[in-house]
Amino acid sequence: MSIKLIAVDMDGTFLSDQKTYNRERFMAQYQQMKAQGIRFVVASGNQYYQLISFFPEIANEIAFVAENGGWVVSEGKDVFNGELSKDAFATVVEHLLTRPEVEIIACGKNSAYTLKKYDDAMKTVAEMYYHRLEYVDNFDNLEDIFFKFGLNLSDELIPQVQKALHEAIGDIMVSVHTGNGSIDLIIPGVHKANGLRQLQKLWGIDDSEVVVFGDGGNDIEMLRQAGFSFAMENAGSAVVAAAKYRAGSNNREGVLDVIDKVLKHEAPFDQ
């Protein structure tokens, strides 16, 4: 048995809480991964244009499962993207606009879009996660391929809002809790696990040859799917239950510590 693919979530997993990682250590590991024929995949709810900014030297060598699986890119080339029909998009927007407690980001292939009327605090956060972001008066007549919505709201409202969204638009989109004060609406079945499946099919890699890392609700499907799945020390109970193993904290390079074990064929990678 040999590992052929390593996939990492970013926020709360690969990145510290300061949104950094040990670049020198990782780049040394990446060279060893290449030498051992191991593919590296970034699997995140974040926008592709934001994700590539973390890996400027190797963005055209590695793969990205961006937007929670909505858009999959390998070596700079499209592998897959989901697409909401115009009718489905309009139905979702119509419902979301009846919910004043949520701020809406419509996630498209060319850009993300949010409303000009939102306050500066929301816009500052949005710009951190969406490097291509347009401010619009409304969501009518936008020409793009849409595969996700990002919703910002108060943490304490998330359980009840998720329940309400499921009842209202659950046949069109699935809500996943992605972290502090945020929910993503994704196309059913178009999640990180599906994105990894597209890449595995392309490369001829079995689930048993895959290592994944995650900490949030949007990681659960890929944690269940992979042969070697690691929930971070900072992960919630549902995520821990979905994973086979635990990794250290995202603030103490927990992912990089496990990658060292992969490269050295140490337990549990020594079968």
Curated annotation (Swiss-Prot):
Any note on cofactor binding? Magnesium. Can also use other divalent metal cations as manganese, cobalt or zinc.
Q: Which keywords describe this protein according to UniProt?
A: Hydrolase, Magnesium, Metal-binding
Q: Which PROSITE patterns does the annotation name? A: COF_2 (PS01229)
Under catalytic activity, the entry for this protein gives: 5-amino-6-(5-phospho-D-ribitylamino)uracil + H2O = 5-amino-6-(D-ribitylamino)uracil + phosphate
Q: Where are the transmembrane segments?
A: none
> Which cofactors are reported in the record for this sequence?
Mg(2+); Mn(2+); Co(2+); Zn(2+)
Note the SUPFAM superfamilies from the entry.
HAD-like
Look up the record and report any one GO term of the cellular component aspect. cytosol
Question: For binding phosphate, which residues are annotated in this chain's numbering?
Answer: M10, S44, G45, K192, N218
Report if keyword Translocase is assigned.
no
Enzyme class name: hydrolase
As recorded in UniProt, its EC number(s) are 3.1.3.104
InterPro entries with a match to the protein in the record = Cof (IPR000150), HAD-like_sf (IPR036412), HAD-SF_hydro_IIB (IPR006379), HAD_sf (IPR023214)
Q: Which domain of life is it from?
A: Bacteria
Drop me one GO molecular function for this one: phosphatase activity
Q: What happens when the gene is disrupted?
A: Cells lacking this gene can grow in the absence of exogenous riboflavin; this may be due to the presence of the functionally redundant protein YigB.
According to its UniProt entry, what is the function of this protein? Catalyzes the dephosphorylation of 5-amino-6-(5-phospho-D-ribitylamino)uracil, and thus could be involved in the riboflavin biosynthesis pathway. Is also able to dephosphorylate flavin mononucleotide (FMN), erythrose 4-phosphate and other phosphoric acid esters.
State the family named in the UniProt similarity comment for this chain: Belongs to the HAD-like hydrolase superfamily. Cof family.
Protein name, please?
5-amino-6-(5-phospho-D-ribitylamino)uracil phosphatase YbjI
